[in-house]
Amino acid sequence: MGPWWALWLILTLPQILGGQSPTMPQGFSQMTSFQSNKFQGEWFVLGLADNTYKREHRPLLHSFITLFKLRDNSEFQVTNSMTRGKHCSTWSYTLIPTNKPGQFTRDNRGSGPGADKENIQVIETDYVKFALVLSLRQASNQNITRVSLLGRDWKITHKTIDRFICLTKTQNLTKNNLLFPDLTDWLLDPKVC
């Protein structure tokens, strides 16, 4: 094994074994601090884009509520609730903080060996109105990229939606990967990205 091969292996093996770790997308500043106590509470998932979703999935998914409950050990217990017809679907998981501000790994304890590792990064937030969240997961030889737009209420500014679109573009997501909101005729402010 030559020195270049060894260097390549050293640099890529952690990502191959551990999944992808979010890096700060172009046009977004690295968080220098993250205030978990301000982030906790109820959020509405107002925007969702995912590279595995297609236009035909839109009728199946729509805005939903997510609750971030801060535990004593700085982990978040996350509970999601979505209505589907006359039924309410709920699912929960734990987010474990990493050493980077606003970055977490999703706890897969109990999921068994080989469970998918998911890295989640709060890219941007003001804590009171909106948050942009990037999730990267390696599953069955497929990289899954998800971008979420969270709001404290159902109203969101045009600038925030533009920032959401900018973040999806940095992740090579297209309008076909946007599940909601419907942005078919949206005109992006070119000064935002």
Curated annotation (Swiss-Prot):
Identify one Pfam family in the record. Lipocalin
Give the stretches traversing the membrane. Answer: none
Q: Which residues form a coiled coil?
A: none
Entry keywords, A to Z: Disulfide bond, Glycoprotein, Secreted, Signal, Transport
Compartment annotation: Secreted
Matching InterPro entries: Calycin (IPR012674), LCN2/LCN12 (IPR003087), Lipocalin (IPR002345), Lipocln_cytosolic_FA-bd_dom (IPR000566)
Which family is annotated? Belongs to the calycin superfamily. Lipocalin family.
**What is the protein name stated in its UniProt record?**
Epididymal-specific lipocalin-12
The gene is Lcn12
